[in-house]
Amino acid sequence: MYRKLAVISAFLATARAQSACTLQSETHPPLTWQKCSSGGTCTQQTGSVVIDANWRWTHATNSSTNCYDGNTWSSTLCPDNETCAKNCCLDGAAYASTYGVTTSGNSLSIGFVTQSAQKNVGARLYLMASDTTYQEFTLLGNEFSFDVDVSQLPCGLNGALYFVSMDADGGVSKYPTNTAGAKYGTGYCDSQCPRDLKFINGQANVEGWEPSSNNANTGIGGHGSCCSEMDIWEANSISEALTPHPCTTVGQEICEGDGCGGTYSDNRYGGTCDPDGCDWNPYRLGNTSFYGPGSSFTLDTTKKLTVVTQFETSGAINRYYVQNGVTFQQPNAELGSYSGNELNDDYCTAEEAEFGGSSFSDKGGLTQFKKATSGGMVLVMSLWDDYYANMLWLDSTYPTNETSSTPGAVRGSCSTSSGVPAQVESQSPNAKVTFSNIKFGPIGSTGNPSGGNPPGGNRGTTTTRRPATTTGSSPGPTQSHYGQCGGIGYSGPTVCASGTTCQVLNPYYSQCL
């Protein structure tokens, strides 16, 4: 949400460009995933991941001389944006030894601190369809499922999985000076309109560059890169959030200075994108026992869990989880006039009314956001620490001068003194996040494991969203489209709305589809 004054928090003290070099070979780590069809048949897809261009070694095209050192540009090689793009190239990546990135079958692990010739912190990776093209997903009318292990992510870290409306080729077709393209991880954009990118639209971002005052490796340039963003999963072992961010222009576009808005600008709301989003964080919504480390929580973050997110054609977003073979719906929220567990227009309106702000609705809300989910979006997986706000917006009380009595201020149980990058990097260098078992297909198609209760008995179920109002002689309340309609331990409506039927996904969860 408040991403990412240094989403790159710290990395190799070298720079980046948008043509390619060959001093280090580029081999994308393989990663398989599954594409599912109605009825639950899934087929394996052969993919791979690529690290973002901002992490790469960049040097002169005719030598190994750095174009960028520490957090400043070479004045000789990079006197201006155009000259720098001509003089500099970005090189291949040693994924495991330099960046702590490893894959095995359908599993991707991202290490936090990796020490090789220099210190690297975190990484941002994209799923590839081919060696030169990002995999695109059309989320609207479909669901996305994955397994995640956040057990080693303490306060201050964010193991994120999300989608952005960036170009599938990394911008090559639009910007001829970008010859590196998706193969080298170019073209990033998000709803913060990041200005810490070294190259945007095939040009350097050196003009107006200001080195960071608290990070020896980063800075902010005169331009940013904007696009719509769907945060499926921003999380550590303490808190998690689901957040759509609309932009008035859906796809990637360049912005200038404080007109970019977002984390990187003095005027946070001055750009074309919504930097805050309509977030669903169970802890922030009052359910402090749903998600966290240990058996006292409904979802125990010391263990792997499955996350399933469904994008209704109406624009609403549903979420459920599976752990140890048991299904748990998103916990119910009571927020002003809203009661339910679906992220929809009513919820987002209530959140702004109760917690303050209007950025989400100002940028068009879910109606505008549907324009992004109805088109292709690129999958991003990352691990980062936060040099801007210490990740307090995710897992603590934020702003820090607020108290527990301030609606929406408490987002997790972490101390307001936690999350300082220097401390997190020194105290938890071996932290990592693992994403695996990615599945994508029509709503109801990706399925999930079934089985008995978790050790110690059933930890309980969460309240389903409020049933639709019934009419006529229908026997009892009717469950709305995509709502739960059955399963062991379930006591809500079992009759589905007209045009849908109750379909068994596993012994603990049936859904109106």
From Swiss-Prot:
Secretion signal span: 1-17
GO biological process: cellulose catabolic process
Highest taxon of source: Eukaryota
Residues annotated as site: Not glycosylated: N81
Record InterPro entries: CBD_sf, Cellulose-bd_dom_fun, ConA-like_dom_sf, Glyco_hydro_7, Glyco_hydro_7_sf
Primary localisation category: secreted
Region described as Catalytic: 18-453
Subcellular localization: Secreted
Compositionally biased tracts (Gly residues): 449-459
Compositional bias per record (Low complexity), positions renumbered to this chain: 460-478
SUPFAM superfamilies in UniProt: Cellulose-binding domain (SSF57180), Concanavalin A-like lectins/glucanases (SSF49899)
Post-translational modification: N-glycosylated. The catalytic core domain comprises three N-linked glycans which each consist of a single N-acetylglucosamine residue. O-glycosylated. Within the linker domain, all 8 threonines are variably glycosylated with between at least one, and up to three, mannose residues per site. All serines in this domain are at least partially glycosylated with a single mannose residue. O-glycosylation of the cellulase linker provides protection from proteolysis. Linker glycans also contribute to binding affinity of cellobiohydrolases to cellulose.
One GO MF term: cellulose binding
SMART domains per the UniProt record, alphabetical: fCBD (SM00236)
Cystine connections: C21-C89, C36-C42, C67-C88, C78-C84, C155-C414, C189-C227, C193-C226, C247-C273, C255-C260, C278-C348, C485-C502, C496-C512
One Gene Ontology cellular component: extracellular region
Compositional bias segments (type: Polar residues): 401-437
Stretches assigned to the CBM1 domain: 477-513
Note on domains (UniProt): The enzyme consists of two functional domains, a catalytic core joined to a carbohydrate-binding domain (CBM) by a serine-, threonine-, and proline-rich, highly glycosylated linker sequence.
Family named by the database record: Belongs to the glycosyl hydrolase 7 (cellulase C) family.
Protein name per its UniProtKB record: Exoglucanase 1
Gene: cbh1
